[in-house]
């Protein structure tokens, strides 16, 4: 299995608040991305914490005797644990009070794609077409779901970056879990630092036209 990963501060921020982890094991291959928020490096702290906590939780609790539904529940509990730890850390450290982060994970296990997410960092599945697996927890996505605006209007909405769910924002969190068949597609996980500037079809083109996923990630 081939992996590629990169994080870049870009031209619009002074601090890179994104973090990621890739687990390249044959048994439980997965990747997680996080996009922090909170200012004064608090977002960077939150995204780093969520990635580390999820990694540690999964390392301790994933087992090959689990079926894919049970593995999904282990992932959910990893997110819930991370949320609680980040929330309490922020509450007790005034310099990072109010910090939070998105978190999106995708794992391939037993020929299934298991995804978990909170916030608006996305997971895509790329085969002949590109398909967004996750559904943004954002203000504009709620407007789209209610039919009040179109997906095209959402791209330029003044509140397009307002998220409605974040890790560490409250003492509890609802984690969306999805399980889909895996048929050899390429999975892409990314923060809005990519999707705010690159169209879905462009992402697909970069991925499909490159044999090396690391080069694809770096060019995107």
Where do the PLM segments sit?
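PP2C/PPM-type serine/threonine phosphatase catalytic domain
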Residues: 1-220
